[in-house]
Curated annotation (Swiss-Prot):
Name of the protein described by the UniProt record: Lysine--tRNA ligase
Lineage, highest ranks first: Bacteria, Pseudomonadati, Pseudomonadota, Gammaproteobacteria, Pseudomonadales
Keywords assigned by UniProt, alphabetized: Aminoacyl-tRNA synthetase, ATP-binding, Cytoplasm, Ligase, Magnesium, Metal-binding, Nucleotide-binding, Protein biosynthesis
Binding positions for Mg(2+) 2 per the UniProt entry: 417
EC number: 6.1.1.6
InterPro entries: Aa-tRNA-synt_II, aa-tRNA-synth_II, aa-tRNA-synth_II/BPL/LPL, Lys-tRNA-ligase_II, Lys-tRNA-ligase_II_N, Lys-tRNA-synth_II_C, NA-bd_OB-fold, NA-bd_OB_tRNA
SUPFAM superfamilies: Class II aaRS and biotin synthetases, Nucleic acid-binding proteins
Example GO BP: lysyl-tRNA aminoacylation
Length: 500
């Protein structure tokens, strides 16, 4: 038996013994009466007190005798004082043997790390300068049956951090910070758009036709209606129906689902912002996106320079704007324009680069395959990649000067796609033809090709104003702003294989 396995078994036996002891303590609490009281109401948060009274001296606090009621989880217990933690931070609470009843002092000795307590008393400052609560009353509110990870081993196993996020949040301030930032980012995006007259809406999660993106859907069955339904891969077609209906500026922040691979950049369930504005084009969205990203960086980091790993992304500088075609040539000087304009040569380049070439792809799709294999990972600083071929952009408007490409961009930062946007196709007949082409692609073996959506075509036949739309991956954006290496670090409960 390996030493590692033996150590793991020893730790498990030790944990089981600790759990058994804590259950005995809970049984003793039950015998006293209500072991889980719910009649305490706090009036202060730990970190708020730290901030509010940071400049008060020991003498000033003693003279003021400021009463407070706090509650939190015991993170440190030294007998005469404890450190408790709430959602804002930590504060010390002092066990004063002169003022607390003997019964309470005896109970305090039985409390463990992880227990949740209430504390009432007055604020004071120690000789070392630490703010604390000198308790006049303290109670156990919730007994923790499982021990917290000890300070030496901690919760260092990454997979366990994802599986037991509740423990991760208890013991890792970095994790708590990440999800506070995530909430802050989403709140600011919402504020940013509402201030610009966008209307927040909700569209169906369950759809009869999965549309709005090239992706594999999750399929389910509606029992009452006896029909197949799909978890949405994107809200796009419903949001554009709303633009047709007269809601000219709309947005939605919600979940999308794609039945595809899991990686440091992909989770089957993820959060997207999608927004649409009439009487605008993809260039307007580029400007809006730059403005939003600069505001978010300034809000979260206090700077438009965004550190990520060993790199720094500069959001304060104009984002590079480059076409798919030109970016391939720029980052692969051994290739020529003639190489990319010949379908047979492009097919060979794509195959050599590692793309999954089926053999029926047109020139535009082959160019995108080459771009994905040879260029994407090289786009470190923010890049708007524009002029995607129309055959891979079935919902985007063709470019007026070159109908082989569309008025579309994707934003890349750190070699990752962060956003996708375009001037929307509002020609109903052209849209119908492109849907038919997508159906042919699907019949030829492309699982990610789109279905034909007759109702969406009908909506366009009523007339949609010139419109620009965009989708931004919230998870990847938060990864950048929190310097997180994996998408699982910014999703509270990422998908994992069941434990054996």
């Amino acid at each position: 038996m390996s030493d590692l396995k033996t150590e793991s078994q020893d730790l498990q036996q030790e944990e089981n013994a600790l759990i058994a002891l804590r259950k005995e303590k809970l049984a003793a609490e039950r015998a006293k009466g209500n072991a889980f009281p719910n009649d305490f109401r706090r009036d202060s948060y730990c970190n708020d007190l730290q901030k509010q009274y940071a400049d008060k001296t020991k003498e000033e606090l003693e003279a003021a005798a400021i009463p407070v009621k706090v509650a939190g989880r015991i993170m440190l217990n030294r007998g005469s004082f404890m450190v408790i933690q709430d959602m804002t931070g930590r504060i010390q609470v002092y066990v004063n043997r002169k003022t607390l009843p003997e019964e309470t002092l005896a109970a305090v000795k039985t409390w463990d790390l992880g227990d949740i307590i209430s504390a009432e008393g007055t604020l004071a400052r120690s000789g070392k300068g630490d703010l604390y609560v000198e308790m006049t009353n303290v109670r156990l509110l919730t007994k923790s049956l499982r021990p917290l990870p000890d300070k030496h081993h901690g919760l260092t196993d990454t997979e366990q951090r994802y599986r037991q996020r509740y423990v991760d949040l208890m013991v890792n301030e970095e994790t708590r910070h990440t999800f506070r930032v995530r909430s802050q980012v989403i709140s600011h995006i919402r504020k940013f758009l509402i201030e610009r007259d966008f209307l927040e809406v909700e569209t169906p999660m369950l759809q009869t036709i999965p549309g709005g993106a090239a992706a594999k859907p999750f399929e389910t069955h509606h029992n009452a209606l006896d029909m197949a339904m799909f978890l949405r891969i994107a809200p796009e077609l419903y949001l554009k129906r709303l633009v047709v209906g007269g809601f000219e500026k709309v947005f939605e922040i919600n979940r999308n689902f794609r039945n595809e691979g899991v990686s440091t950049r992909h989770n089957p369930e993820f959060t997207m912002l999608e927004f649409y504005q009439a009487y605008a084009d993809y260039r307007d969205n580029m400007d809006l996106t730059e403005e939003l990203f600069r505001e978010l960086a300034q809000l979260v980091l206090g700077s438009t320079d965004v550190p990520y790993g060993d790199k720094v992304f500069h959001f304060g500088e104009p984002f590079v704007r480059l076409s798919v075609f030109d970016s391939i040539l720029k980052y692969n000087p051994e290739l020529t324009a003639a190489d990319l304009q010949d379908v047979d040569r492009a097919r060979e380049i794509a195959k050599k680069a590692g793309a999954k070439v089926l053999g029926h792809e047109g020139l535009g799709k082959l160019q995108v395959m080459i771009f994905e294999e040879l260029v994407e990972h090289k786009l470190e600083q923010p890049h708007f990649i524009t002029e995607y071929p129309f055959e891979v952009s079935p919902l985007a408007r063709r470019n007026d000067d070159n109908p082989a490409v569309t008025d579309r961009f994707e934003l890349f930062i750190g070699g990752r796609e962060i956003a996708n946007a375009y001037s929307e196709l509002n020609d109903a007949e052209d849209q119908a033809e492109r849907f038919l082409a997508q159906v042919a692609e699907k019949d030829a073996g492309d699982d990610e090709a789109m279905h034909y959506d007759a109702d969406f075509v009908r909506a366009l036949e009523y007339g949609m104003p010139p419109t620009a739309g965009e989708g931004i991956g919230i998870d990847r954006l938060v990864m950048l702003l929190t310097n997180s290496p994996s998408i699982r670090d910014v999703i509270l409960f990422p998908h994992m294989r069941p434990q054996a």
